Amino acid sequence: LLGIGLVAATLAAWTQARAQEVNLMNGVTPRPGDERTTAPNQFKKDGPWKIGMSHFGVNANTWTVQMAHDAEAAAKLDKRVGQFILLDANISQAKQVADIEDLVAQKVDAIIVTPLTPTSADAGIEKAVAAGIPVIVHTGLTETDKYTVDIQGGGVHFGKVMGDFLVKQLGGKGKIWVLRGLPAHPEDINRYKGLLEAIKGTDVKIIAEDAGKWQYDVGKQVCETLYLNNPQVDGIWSSGADMTRACVDVFQQYGAKIPPITGEGNNGFFARWIELGFPSISPEYGPEQGAAGVRAAVALLEGKQLHKRYIYEPEGWDLEKAKKYYRKDLSANAWFPTSLTEQDLQKYYGKH
């Protein structure tokens, strides 16, 4: 009888824990094979809360700007968040180190970190956790695993979705260009790993690669240089939509046929894709991850249990899905999926 009671109690506790599963963002799920969680009420605190965020570079590109907007909007939405301090490392490792130390010194209740490089935030994360401050990591990897919660999107999966698409488009054989993101950024390193995984064992060969830094202007310079050097290319793997848009514009400028090229959930890219209909795929990497980080911080401060590690690996979008999200009334700088309200979308991206 005792055994039955114990099983029932365990089952009840398990059901309760499952019922409390926090939805951080659509597509974000606990990492399979990692059962680690925070303890119930481990970080529970009465509000108002002071939440800090160390952003690797708000103005690195249009996506990073919106990810910051998504984070700020999510914090503003919860009245228990008395203060949301967003510090911008501006693509400087030294600044990110100082920013995290600053947030620890300010005794914030939780810290969200988007690391610039795989090691730029490690010491700060360990220091914060040692001080009893929960740390949430997203949009980039860390070498340390001392963080409280990790949300890993994009990365290898993102790069592989694009690589698999090109392999399929080219029938397993052909020459491709590679446009990479910000050098040394963990997201760029992992997306590239995903591409290499996808083309391994095929006859798809990389004939040229360069860093477009996830920016339209730099991407355009890179693409134009590659085109003028040798326009014979069968497909293009682009690590970000602003660079994809730039490449599409280069091919248009020279009156050339646009080869299969990979995209991303960006309004400006969607406009070109819908208008021109070239072969593409859009892996998902929403700026809503900024909001997911804030939601994780709030959940911990509410005393909820979270998994230590989450993944965000949705399927790539096809043209039909892009058409559903595309907004003619918003600028090219808007990204999806986002949790920004209609009011915020119009404020930041409305074509006034």
Where do the language-model regions lie?
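N-terminal export leaders
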Residues: 1-3, 22-23
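Bacterial N-terminal signal peptides
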Residues: 2-13
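A residue-level marker of the well-folded mature domains of exported/periplasmic proteins
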Residues: 11-352
